[in-house]
Amino acid sequence: MAMRTPEELSNLIKDLIEQYTPEVKMVDFGIVFQVGDGIARIYGLEKAMSGELLEFEDGTLGIALNLEANNVGAVLLGDGLKITEGSRVRCTGKIAEIPVGEAYLGRVVDGLARPVDGKGAVQTKDSRAIESPAPGIVARRSVYEPLATGLVAVDAMIPVGRGQRELIIGDRQTGKTAIAVDTILNQKGKGVICVYVAIGQKASSVAQVLNTLKERGALDYTIIVMANANEPATLQYLAPYTGATLAEYFMYTGRPTLTIYDDLSKQAQAYREMSLLLRRPPGREAYPGDVFYLHSRLLERAAKLNNALGEGSMTALPIVETQEGDVSAYIPTNVISITDGQIFLAAGLFNSGLRPAINVGISVSRVGSAAQPKAMKQVAGKLKLELAQFAELEAFSQFASDLDQATQNQLARGARLREILKQPQSSPLSVEEQVASLYAGTNGYLDKLEVSQVRAYLSGLRSYLANSYPKYGEILRSTLTFTPEAEGLVKQAINEYLEEFKSQAKAA
């Protein structure tokens, strides 16, 4: 290699100097003067924006929430154990974003969409802001497609449509999560992407849900977002928005999605904790003044998009826990007013053996009836009224000794209709199975059986229909209408199986 002369070297250096353009990079730095309980107070950061991501010396991220006269209050997205007084903080100029994409299906992630299932990193190119704006009025269309839950009580009387927000509300241990998980199981083979968000739950409860979904092959189309009870309040507050963001990716690619928030009471409590530590003024039940906005901006992201945007949808099933059935508390009333209806679960019904323990009287679906399949409307039209009258009569009959025959008949019919609504956990039914059961009940065919025999008979009838009259199922699946031909087949099957069932009962 030839040695360069001093002249050549000086010319080379001159060229490099001429090509150099000085760059001045301004970084807004601040100093931590107080840290603890997941909150940091910082001097400086005069150009920080509300909701901006901040980076601490040890790599921990935070979000600027309080912009005060001489300091910034930030919440930490981690334990922050290495942050001390005097630590430096810098603005990033970004807001909280998470990666999104197909690769998340079947994965378990934390409140910032980081995998926690030990299956390695999630390979994806796209990302979305955690706090994305909800679709506007022009971007939406009215709810018109059904989202079948597989539960007779819900699909017949409180139907849910794709793009709807339907609240599941009740005391602890009344089966709220069971309804949500059954709905996920029932989406198998229907192309619906499900996101289950566990907020402030025990790790064992989330593991139980995960195992149920795995066993039933439902994890392939489901994402689980978890912010357990032992995680910082910030992650419990962000987890629902992360779940909505993951679902939005699929919604904007034209697919139906289902998001379950289990439960929003815990998110509100985490937000209350953060707000009180940030010294924000407390309001009713010590919640901050913007706790309504906390839930409204989350649930407004659920929508049915119009044709131009690909007709995707996000259906939200938020869960709220009540204390002693008190639906007039602050968070329950807020979420009831935001959602398009509620499924109310009563502890008394649950303990009396009616499961799912849905109180039909005060449960309602404000937009779902437009999405209910025609076949279901045909057989379940008067069901809610009949059950309400039965509940009234049942209460009255406890005090009356001699009842006329018509009242006795109505009580007998009501008891059998109530049996139709009972359903074991993790066994959702298809529309054709539900229609056959309801037709048998509302037309008096079950009156010939003892109340204790009804569930066994209906279970056998469903198998008998599938094996002996497959055409009935084909008609309902293709037309979603209870045609005269389908009705004839069901009548025939009911009568035939009734004789068979009675002879089996006698033999036993």
Curated annotation (Swiss-Prot):
One cellular component (GO) term of this entry: proton-transporting ATP synthase complex
Any matching Pfam family: ATP-synt_ab_C
Leading EC class: translocase
GO MF entries: ADP binding; ATP binding; proton-transporting ATP synthase activity, rotational mechanism
Annotated SUPFAM superfamilies: C-terminal domain of alpha and beta subunits of F1 ATP synthase, N-terminal domain of alpha and beta subunits of F1 ATP synthase, P-loop containing nucleoside triphosphate hydrolases
Superkingdom assignment: Eukaryota
Functional description taken from the UniProt entry: F(1)F(0) ATP synthase produces ATP from ADP in the presence of a proton or sodium gradient. F-type ATPases consist of two structural domains, F(1) containing the extramembraneous catalytic core and F(0) containing the membrane proton channel, linked together by a central stalk and a peripheral stalk. During catalysis, ATP synthesis in the catalytic domain of F(1) is coupled via a rotary mechanism of the central stalk subunits to proton translocation. The alpha chain is a regulatory subunit.
The protein's name: ATP synthase subunit alpha, chloroplastic
